[in-house]
């Protein structure tokens, strides 16, 4: 049996005495700090204090000449699509474009005029009057879904209206192209920081030949003129995710994964040749949903993503090659103009990037970065961003930093970033009492993790867990979220599943329904399906595909596990709403079976709920769930309906959750549910801690164990190894305790 050397226990947290004992303040490296022209001396002081080995500029800040000789790496934020209004103004036809859809308007006679820009901000968007509307626009009767003939509508340029021959009391929309005359990210930063005198930055289309040639030559000149810059931080490449403002400068539509602003007649003509069929605006505007990630992607939209990946990655490689030719590193920011790069797609590695950096808002968004292959290193920009909205009246930057690190840390222990950093106005962070001390603690713990793991991987269970949705591996760690870790009432009960998984001892795969039909790999023991009915994450019409349901039934029947959260396998068909109701042991009452009596009774005595005290948080939950079949057990109920149910199905198990928002307790419940579903309960205590607020990570090759307290209170927890009690630990709030494991 493995034992612990109690004399080798090492504690790390924010306490100054503890930092002195562990030597954290003496460590350097793995940290990037922002700077600006008016904070040179303070930058040097903080660089030395925090042990930073890289400095960077940001949008709205400058790298001071006085810091160019500092013995650290210098990052320069580089924009391929903006910060050159002169070029954009000289070439208005090559300004970036976006597909918009007008308001839905009801005709009350046989003629209707639709104002195109109603509800849009005219400082951001301008109707494209240069290209033929009859070729690139589309008018649709939304009552019937039919496309209105181009002979039955006219564009009135002077009024920016479309006049349509209509059927009374039918609804109509116009899909049209507009120029992005104010870069969306610059507009966001302008509004957020209340900039007054900064010119609006136009955004130009690097995909088009004239601009492409200009941008390449400009990059070469920039590299020659900036010999002291070590890392070119592309922010990013060519197409901005969809970020559209309304006429009151409020965010109107935000889709972090959106392709609506990656279009132009030039690009679309190339797509038509590549795809072999005619392009329609509807492929992009998608009835007004703009192909939100929650939509089941159409064949045409998947084709468009494939085409864009090929084109974007090939052109990005040309820019990266230029950077490399000057002896510099090329880094990509995962955000802003990242559309088309698809880091989990099959073309990304061909770009040849040295690094990827992205914003870390949670464990999920950290894994979104740290799991990327095909680069030499990854970097996470931790929160909070040093902007006035946080570092101002009513803001709580220290609290935000603590919460951000608590979620990020558990994911780092599973899949570490190589570096961390911050962004924004360093002066704001420097002047906020206690904030720099908080960063010291975070950076110290990050370095300690790397020192103790020493490039090895943490222990994982002897089986894989797969998340099943329509996107599969293309959007690894990206599902069930609206906009990059932004909380939404409609999503947090599902997104919590991925947040829990991000720090758990499992290898997690993301698979699509096409993958299922090809056969489930033997190393996958548990499959999770989570989401609302008819979304891409639940699966919609895929659940009436005979090959899908029979393959999954066989998988569970032969010993696999299937976990459903929310409305899994949902599609009303043949007397069922949950198409795998027989596997899950539950279905949802849609009103059709109210005449059928249900006799549901709770029995919470189960392996999954051991160690669990108090009520379970199901978030928004899913209502009207009832258990059915002969082999179910209801572990939690809300009135007469079920919230947590387990079900025996052949040699395997089904588990159903009405919802699962992130919390330490829900992480523990899901952990136990996965081991139960896999039929491998005995493996759970290979390495285990009893308190639900704590988690354990083991680096077997280094004989190191980390126990973390994910709460803001002191707690006791018992450590088990190979099922045997080893030691009781008392952990301070947020503490990370390291122990040496010896034979």
Question: Where do the model's predicted regions map?
Answer:
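Extracellular ligand-binding/catalytic regions of CAZymes and related secreted enzymes
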Residues: 243-246, 427-459, 576-579, 584-592, ...
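A glycine-rich, often tryptophan-bearing local segment used as a flexible ligand/cofactor-contacting loop or short
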Residues: 539-615
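A short, well-structured beta->alpha microelement
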Residues: 31-44, 58-62, 332-341, 499-520
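Hydrophobic targeting/anchoring helices
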Residues: 50, 86-88, 219-220, 233-237, ...
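The substrate-binding groove and active-site-proximal loops of carbohydrate-active enzymes
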Residues: 29-34, 53-54, 194-213, 296-313, ...
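Polysaccharide-binding and catalytic clefts of secreted carbohydrate-active enzymes
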Residues: 92-350, 368
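Catalytic domains of carbohydrate-active enzymes, especially glycoside hydrolases
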Residues: 38-73, 221-233, 407-414
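A short helix->loop->beta-strand "cap" motif at the edges of active sites that frequently abuts
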Residues: 72, 327-328, 376, 558-561
């Amino acid at each position: 049996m493995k034992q612990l050397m109690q004399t080798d226990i090492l504690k790390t947290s924010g306490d100054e005495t503890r930092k002195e004992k562990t030597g954290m303040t003496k460590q350097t490296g793995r940290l990037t700090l922002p700077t600006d022209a008016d904070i040179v001396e303070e930058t040097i002081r903080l660089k030395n204090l925090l042990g930073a080995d890289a400095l960077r500029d940001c949008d709205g800040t400058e790298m001071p000449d006085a810091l160019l000789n500092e013995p650290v790496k210098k990052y320069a934020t580089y924009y391929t699509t903006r910060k050159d209004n002169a070029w954009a103004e000289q070439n208005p036809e090559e300004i970036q474009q976006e597909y918009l859809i007008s308001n839905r308007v009801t005709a009350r006679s046989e003629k209707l005029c639709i104002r195109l820009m109603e509800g849009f901000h005219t400082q951001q968007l301008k109707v494209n009057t240069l290209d033929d509307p009859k070729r690139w626009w589309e008018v649709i009767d939304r009552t019937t879904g039919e496309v209105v003939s181009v002979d039955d509508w006219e564009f009135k340029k002077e009024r920016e209206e479309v006049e349509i021959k209509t059927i009374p009391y039918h609804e109509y929309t116009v899909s049209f192209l507009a120029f992005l005359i104010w870069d969306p990210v610059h507009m966001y930063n302008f509004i957020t920081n209340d900039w007054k005198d900064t010119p609006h930055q136009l955004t130009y289309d690097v995909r088009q030949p004239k601009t492409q040639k200009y941008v390449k030559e400009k990059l070469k000149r920039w590299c020659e003129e900036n010999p002291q810059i070590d890392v070119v931080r592309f922010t990013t490449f060519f197409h901005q995710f969809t970020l559209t403002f309304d006429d009151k400068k409020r965010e109107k539509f935000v889709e972090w994964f959106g392709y609506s602003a990656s279009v132009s007649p030039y690009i679309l003509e190339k797509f038509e040749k590549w795809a072999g069929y005619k392009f329609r605006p509807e492929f992009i505007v998608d009835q007004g949903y703009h192909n939100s990630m929650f939509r089941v992607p159409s064949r045409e939209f998947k084709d468009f993503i494939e085409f864009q990946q090929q084109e974007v990655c090939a052109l990005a490689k040309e820019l990266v090659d230029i950077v490399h030719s000057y002896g510099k590193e090329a880094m990509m920011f995962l955000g802003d103009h990242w559309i088309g790069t698809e880091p989990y797609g099959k073309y990304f590695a061909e770009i040849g990037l040295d690094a990827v950096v992205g914003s870390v808002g949670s464990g999920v968004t950290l894994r979104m970065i740290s799991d990327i292959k095909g680069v030499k290193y990854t970097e996470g920009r931790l929160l909070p961003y040093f902007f006035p909205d946080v570092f101002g009246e009513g803001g709580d930057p220290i609290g935000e930093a603590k919460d951000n690190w608590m979620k990020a840390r558990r994911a780092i222990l599973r899949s570490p970033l190589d570096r961390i950093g911050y962004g924004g106005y360093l002066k704001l962070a420097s002047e906020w009492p206690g904030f720099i001390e908080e960063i010291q603690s975070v950076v110290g713990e990050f370095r300690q993790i790397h020192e103790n793991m020493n490039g090895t991987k943490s222990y994982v269970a002897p089986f894989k867990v797969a998340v099943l949705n329509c996107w599969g591996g293309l959007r690894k760690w990206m599902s069930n979220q609206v906009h990059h870790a932004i909380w939404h009432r409609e999503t947090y009960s599902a997104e919590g599943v991925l947040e829990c998984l991000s720090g758990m001892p499992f290898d997690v795969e993301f698979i699509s329904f096409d993958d299922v039909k090809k056969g489930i790999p033997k190393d996958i023991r548990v499959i999770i399906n989570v989401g609302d009915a008819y979304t891409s994450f639940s699966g919609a019409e895929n659940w009436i595909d005979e090959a899908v349901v029979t393959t999954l039934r066989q998988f569970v029947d032969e010993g696999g596990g299937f976990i459903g959260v929310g409305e899994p396998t949902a599609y009303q068909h043949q007397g069922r709403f949950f198409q795998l109701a027989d596997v899950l042991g539950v279905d949802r009452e849609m009103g059709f079976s109210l005449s059928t009596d249900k006799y549901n009774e709770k029995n919470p005595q189960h392996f999954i709920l051991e160690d669990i005290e108090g009520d379970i948080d199901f978030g928004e939950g899913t209502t009207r769930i009832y258990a059915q079949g002969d082999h179910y057990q209801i572990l939690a109920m809300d009135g007469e309906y079920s919230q947590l149910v387990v079900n025996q199905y052949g040699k395997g198990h089904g588990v159903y959750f009405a919802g699962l928002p992130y919390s330490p307790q829900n992480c523990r419940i899901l952990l136990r549910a996965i081991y139960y579903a896999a039929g491998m309960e005995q493996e759970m205590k290979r390495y285990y801690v009893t308190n639900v607020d704590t988690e354990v990570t083991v680096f077997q090759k280094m004989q190191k164990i980390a126990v973390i307290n994910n709460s803001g209170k002191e707690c006791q927890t018992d450590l088990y190894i190979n099922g045997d009690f080893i030691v009781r630990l008392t952990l301070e709030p947020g503490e990370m305790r390291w122990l040496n494991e010896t034979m």
